[in-house]
Amino acid sequence: MKYISALTLLVMLAFAGNSILVRLALSTDCIGSLSFSIIRLLAGALVLALIAKPKQTLESGSWLSALYLLVYVLFFSYAYLSLDAGTGALILFAAVQIVMIGSGLWHGERLAALQWAGMTMACLGLFFLLRPGAASSPNLTGAVLMGLSGLGWALYSLRGRHAESPVLATAGNFAKASVYVVGVSIPLLFVLPEEYPSAKGIVLAIISGAITSGLGYTLWYKVLPNLPATRASIAQLSVPAIAAIGGMIFLNETVTTRLIITTALVLGGVAMATLWPSKQAA
């Protein structure tokens, strides 16, 4: 059990590490958002293909799942042009959970009163964070982009729930998303031109793709069968907090009282909504 707990902590550090790495790269102007996304997907695809075997990788995954993955990765990178690491991770996490809970409702799940209270609390927390006019409000464009990134990741996760081999499916989806990103890069560069990335930016993007994404997702799928659903959900609640602490240490970002209150409201609300058993519609 200690071994599983240690691996789970390592995976959560990897997930939070994606926020820190992209923010570190973009805040120092050593790489553009599109370049970071391209390298991240290519590096992730390469590592996952080596783990899953190249031939099987090309035959796995789906183009629709890959499109959702592309939406997540692209909007994630562009959102972090204007968001702190902790704030971005919190918005992403909240968006993912809200979409997934909404999907459950659409497919017949019924929420208990405590779950509705949790959803309300999480939404109030987001409103408190994003409400216009406050001095410490995050950039609205960045927040919207991160919300779209969360939508992409939620749809990707929902499609991958019943994959027979999650690692193989992820490898195939990363490979297909790499094809997509090359295709959209030319029109995007016309609209949002970027300078050539520096060596530092390239290295950070490779680490994000190969290690915190590729290896991180692989480890997560290895750990999941050994974790009860409640423990898996609780573990993921730690990611925004870890990202905020990492942003404070590595990026000199300020963790404000407002962010602390918002994080408590959102994570507490999501915990209430996801850890309490739902009912199926009769």
Residue spans for each PLM region:
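Specific transmembrane alpha-helical segments of multi-pass solute transporters/efflux pumps
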Residues: 49, 55-93, 101, 121-128, ...
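Specific alpha-helical transmembrane segments that line the substrate/conduction pathway
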Residues: 35-43, 78-110, 149, 229-248
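Hydrophobic alpha-helical transmembrane segments of multi-pass integral membrane proteins
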Residues: 3-10, 34-50, 118-121, 141, ...
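C-terminal transmembrane-helix exit sites in multi-pass transporters
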Residues: 47-55, 78, 95-120, 127, ...
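Hydrophobic transmembrane alpha-helices of multi-pass small-molecule transport proteins
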Residues: 48, 69, 111-131, 150, ...
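Glycine-/small-residue-enriched transmembrane alpha-helix faces in small-molecule transporters
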Residues: 1-35, 67, 74-75, 124, ...
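Helix-helix packing/entry segments at the starts of transmembrane helices
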Residues: 88-95, 160-180, 210-249
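C-terminal-most transmembrane helix of multi-pass membrane proteins
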Residues: 37, 41, 237-282
